[in-house]
Amino acid sequence: MAEFSLHLTDDQLQIKDWIHEFAKDVMRPAAQEWDDREEFPWPIVQEAAKIGLYGIEFMMNAMSDASGLTLPVAIEEIFWGDAGLGMAIMGSGLAAAGITGNGTPEQIMEWVPQCYGTADDIKLGAFCVS
């Protein structure tokens, strides 16, 4: 077993920089507008999906990192961009986590991808507790 380390790998640093650029160039300039509009920021989520930041593939890759650091680094950079827009981009993960934690393999395979849709047909996962 490898020794625990908080040092980021070259791949993790590349992901961090990639997301930071998206947050700086797309999220920060748009944050106030979407906050003022009080609407869901579909264009921002669509931009995230176009570059591969919003989608099941990104989440699966980030969550399968053995060091456990890729997803927290990604989330930190997204939320550096803006917390509200970050929730719009990362929010489907809550529904996906509920399904993954409690669903059968068949349910997971059917429903988790539907929490995200595709870059051309974006979907949102919703989480309800009663």
Which residues does each predicted region cover?
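Intrinsic disorder at enzyme termini
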Residues: M1-D11
